[in-house]
Amino acid sequence: MFRRRTAALTAPLLALAATMVAAAPAQAVPADKPQVLTRWTQTAPASYTQWADARAHRTKWSAYGFDWSTDYCTSSPDNPLGFPFRMSCAHHDFGYRNYKAAGTFAANKPRLDSMFHADLRRACTRYTGTKKKSCDALAWTYYQAVKRFGH
């Protein structure tokens, strides 16, 4: 008798629990996601620093649903002639992927490409003389490539 009563109560309770789980509201993306994305995709050094810190601590930002994936500098060298362009490319990819997901890529592409150029130029500041000129020239070339062919 006890087993029948337990079995009779178990099925409805399981069904109720499943319904409650299915009916639980999905986590909403924070309302300030566009502002955070904009803040992290500016030409200023602070913008890059904030993005790099967030990238290093992605789990803190998981509710925002940002796309952190990157192929770095795509088919171009990530560190041409030893110049450290890899993270500038990752920052650029972050901007492209997330503005595409937001449906506002075309309006933001010029700024994202300028941000990329600013990041590359900052990567060149550690050099002097001919080496700096070479780095700046490569930064300009990478910038022109994304400006013209980036999509």
Language model: regions and residue ranges:
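Extended terminal accessory/targeting regions
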Residues: 2-12, 20-151
